[in-house]
């Protein structure tokens, strides 16, 4: 029996899935980890948490599925996009990673547009405007605000590609995820030498870029021992979380569109050609399908808003869920169902980490509007769900 593992490096946790060639799911496991916000608008994680979560979730999947390690024939990776992992000459993490929903880089976005020769020129180079969530502004932020750390940087990786590095020892990425760095020539599916030169970012700091289905390396002996797998298992390029999800949803041909919700909320459309929004309101990236592209819009705090609500106001439901052996979101959803559609005039604005689509504003903030004495917990829970959708 041939078994394949998919490892997704999410914002709230890492999920590993084991499937057969037929698509039958044998087992899954999720390991959660923290997110740090040392200042308003900042969002960081420790890359070591991703690696520990990946290793633990793989071991759990093998155990739960009763899977023989020798049956595992390949590993695919997906994950949260745009995050910046800075490594030194020894391949060690220099500081916590800045995430996709981090909003500290407004000044760096302006700097990028200026260096590129204006917003229109930038979009002409990489098909997208400079947005605070993207990777390139984070690189400039490190250079501008932590020069002592920037001087130590020898490699810059995306979240899933850091896990790839720990699995294979290879510095590698793939086109769908690399598109979200703002440093990829999306048309050519290669790093933009022109923009890198204008930003004075050394090309050797960036990894080799593969197509998503290409083998990017094989499992090292050290990683294999930790995961409980044989050495030499191929690890393919994989994809950014949205591109990988789109393939799973069948969004691989002209005219197909998906709407999905995780921490963020995304509308994703396949394209056979490069489709560029001159206004920069939506993103144009390489698809994880060779020779194809996609356009997408992203609301930063969709499911993330409901997670925030659970953490801040759902302690009773979380305790009850633990006692019952169910997911706390199940109880919160039942609670929300007690309020009518529209939450009787209570509205939630889900701008907990700024916003990206259709109004790119890192300073946007969330709010409840329309509160009255009539509103109870069911209204608040439902309003968060409605505001995020």
Short names for language-model regions:
Residues 63-100, 126-135, 164-185, 208-211, ...:
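Short beta-strand-loop/turn "lid" adjacent to the catalytic site in phosphate-handling enzymes
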Residues 31-33, 211, 287:
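Active-site donor-binding loop signature of nucleotide-sugar glycosyltransferases
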Residues 31, 98-105, 178, 263-265:
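Short, acidic/turn-prone active-site loops that include or flank metal/cofactor-
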Residues 5-6, 47, 106, 113-129, ...:
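Active-site core segments that coordinate phosphate-bearing ligands/cofactors
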Residues 1-95, 107, 124, 152, ...:
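N-terminal glycine/serine-rich phosphate-binding loop of ATP-dependent small-molecule kinases
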Residues 204-210, 234-236:
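General small-molecule cofactor/ligand-binding pocket signal
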């Amino acid at each position: 029996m041939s078994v394949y593992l998919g490892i997704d490096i999410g914002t709230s946790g890492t999920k590993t899935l084991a499937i057969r060639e037929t698509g039958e799911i044998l087992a899954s496991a999720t390991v959660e980890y923290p997110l740090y916000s040392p200042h308003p608008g900042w969002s960081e994680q420790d890359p070591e948490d991703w690696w520990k979560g990946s290793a633990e979730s793989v071991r759990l999947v093998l155990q739960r599925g009763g899977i023989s390690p020798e049956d595992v024939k390949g590993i695919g990776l997906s994950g949260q996009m745009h995050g910046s992992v800075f490594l030194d000459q020894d391949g060690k993490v220099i500081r916590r990673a800045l995430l996709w929903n981090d909003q500290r880089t407004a000044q760096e976005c302006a700097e990028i547009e200026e260096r590129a020769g204006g917003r229109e020129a930038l979009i002409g180079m990489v098909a997208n405007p400079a947005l605070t969530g993207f990777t390139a502004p984070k690189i400039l932020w490190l250079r501008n605000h932590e020069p002592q750390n920037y001087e130590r940087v020898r490699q810059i990786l995306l979240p899933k590609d850091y896990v790839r590095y720990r699995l294979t020892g290879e510095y590698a990425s793939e086109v769908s995820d690399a598109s979200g760095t703002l440093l990829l020539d999306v048309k050519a599916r290669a790093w933009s030498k022109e923009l890198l030169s204008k930003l004075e970012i050394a090309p050797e700091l960036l990894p080799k870029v593969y197509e998503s289905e290409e083998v990017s390396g094989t499992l090292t002996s050290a990683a294999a021992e930790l995961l409980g797998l044989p050495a030499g298992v191929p690890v393919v390029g994989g994809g950014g979380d949205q591109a990988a999800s789109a393939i799973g949803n069948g969004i691989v041909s002209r005219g197909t569109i998906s709407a999905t919700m995780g921490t963020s909320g995304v509308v994703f459309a396949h394209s056979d050609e490069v489709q560029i929004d001159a206004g920069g309101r939506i993103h144009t990236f390489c698809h994880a399908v060779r020779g194809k592209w996609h356009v997408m819009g992203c609301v930063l705090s969709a499911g993330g808003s409901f997670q925030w609500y659970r953490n801040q106001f759902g302690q009773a439901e979380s305790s009850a869920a633990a006692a019952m052996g169910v997911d706390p979101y199940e109880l919160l959803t039942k609670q929300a169902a007690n309020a009518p559609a529209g939450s009787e005039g209570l509205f939630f604005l889900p701008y907990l980490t700024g916003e990206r689509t259709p109004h790119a504003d890192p300073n946007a903030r969330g709010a409840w509007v329309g509160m009255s004495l009539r509103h109870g917990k069911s209204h608040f829970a439902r309003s968060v769900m409605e505001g995020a959708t």
